[in-house]
Amino acid sequence: VLEQVKGVEKHYFSGPHPAGNVGVQIHHVDPISKGEIVWTVDIQNVALIGRFFRTGRVDLRKIVALTGSEILEPRYYEVISGAPVSSIVRKADVRNASDGHGYRIISGNVLTGRRVEPDGYLGFYGNQVTVIPEGDHFEFLGWGMPRLDKFSVSRSYFSWLTPRKRYVLDTNMNGGVRAYVVTGLYDKYLPMDIYPLYLLKAIL
């Protein structure tokens, strides 16, 4: 369908997150300067606008992805914008839901979404619901363990010996507030041609 759209300029993006973020895409297509404003609309809202002009009715139906390591069978659901997240999650098989382990529901993805309670609601612009382990457990002297089952982008843990292993990440921060350490990892992973460390220092 998108390939048949006329009168528009098309740009194609691929790669890992955050290649799909509109801010990153704008940065690479036509970077904005101070004081400029850019309007964006996603494909589902284009369809919403089209249905309104075609029928004269506001139809807020949308497709939402139910994802996350705690969902045994990720899939898509048709819902109304602002629907209760319970109406989506209860249709799925949630891993460990019956053995007392908690899980966190996120309206959106794990990096940019927001936590919602089981009786909460999907955000108007939300296209995804993510369910991950709550991380309400603690390790005794975890800092002194080899951490063979913990993910790290550096070689802090011995898990770098198994680079193909897939991990189930939870919300446990493994400690409290720590000092900001300059490691160069922000420069390595940020997909923009800026100096992230200087930006973070200016913000802090």
State where each predicted segment sits.
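Buried, small/hydrophobic-residue-enriched core segments of structured protein domains
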Residues: 1-204
